């Protein structure tokens, strides 16, 4: 069957006008989250300062992982369109997607993971984080959510969204085009997946394997090819569907200033510059002028 697939000619597609990667959307909400947490250092109660520092460190690690994946994509020298950090909603389902890569023969949804510990995947597909001593002995295993399953949910949402916006393309073609992969961005992470189901094992790669993974997908004879017009139309649909999300403090954070009743973020002390209350101090929302919530200071 594979030999017959190899012999089957691919549909003819007009040559693309570009030959290297193009970032259609290149930014990360993680960077904005870190910047906000840095600003909140002076606003949080002293007892939670260490927790805030740990949260910043965790987000910074994730951001570095995204940068690693972005670097690999930029240096793939493949004619692909790339969208980074999409927040999509469809049928009351939401998805925070790290990267979507659009090529003529595939649409790849990438989940980036910067994991510090080694990972074990069992024969049932369960994921465990392995904690080691300084000598390398595993002293504890802790279950974690399955990133492959999570990413598949992102693919399912993407399929619904795109099939609604581009009904001319049959549903089975979306099933063929849409692919998913989890990229481990920490070169020191060891993944023990020898006993993992093939459908799980094949969806996890190291960041230095990403370019070869893209090439394999590009060369695969799926019988479905997108034109450049299709590729750019898909990118436009996803950019239009993307929703910006205001970052709110993690649960149980306590601040020395009130939170905005509308945005749930620490408010900023300000002084009225005009009007009957000129000179009076008040707390205003940092999202002004989008949000005009205030709390007067007696």
What do the predicted segments below correspond to?
Residues 98:
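Cell-envelope/extracellular polymer assembly enzymes that use nucleotide-activated donors
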């Amino acid at each position: 069957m594979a030999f017959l697939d190899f012999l089957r000619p691919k549909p003819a597609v007009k040559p693309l006008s570009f030959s290297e990667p193009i970032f259609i959307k290149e930014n990360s909400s993680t960077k904005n989250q870190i910047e906000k947490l840095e600003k909140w250092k002076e606003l949080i109660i002293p007892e939670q300062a260490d927790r805030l520092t740990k949260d910043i460190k965790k987000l910074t690690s994730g951001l570095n992982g995204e940068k690693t994946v972005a670097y690999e994509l930029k240096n793939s020298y493949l004619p692909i369109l790339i969208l980074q950090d999409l927040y999509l909603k469809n049928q009351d389902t939401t998805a925070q997607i790290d990267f979507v890569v659009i090529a003529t023969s595939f649409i790849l949804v990438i989940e980036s993971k910067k994991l510090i510990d080694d990972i074990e995947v069992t024969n049932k597909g369960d994921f465990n984080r392995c904690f080691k001593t300084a000598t390398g002995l595993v002293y504890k295993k802790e279950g974690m959510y399955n990133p492959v399953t999570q990413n598949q949910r992102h693919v399912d949402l993407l399929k619904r969204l795109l099939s609604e916006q581009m009904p001319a393309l049959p549903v089975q073609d979306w099933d063929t085009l849409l692919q998913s992969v989890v990229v481990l961005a920490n070169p020191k992470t060891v993944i023990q997946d020898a006993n993992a189901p093939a459908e799980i094992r094949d969806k996890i790669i190291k960041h230095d394997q990403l370019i070869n993974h893209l090439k394999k997908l590009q060369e695969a004879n799926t019988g479905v090819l997108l034109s450049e017009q299709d590729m750019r139309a898909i990118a436009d649909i996803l950019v239009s569907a993307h929703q910006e999300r205001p970052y709110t403090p993690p649960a149980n954070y306590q601040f020395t200033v009130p939170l905005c009743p509308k945005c749930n973020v620490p408010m900023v002390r300000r002084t009225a510059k005009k009007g009957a209350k000129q000179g009076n101090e008040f707390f205003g929302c940092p999202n002004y002028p989008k949000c005009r919530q205030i709390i007067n200071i007696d």
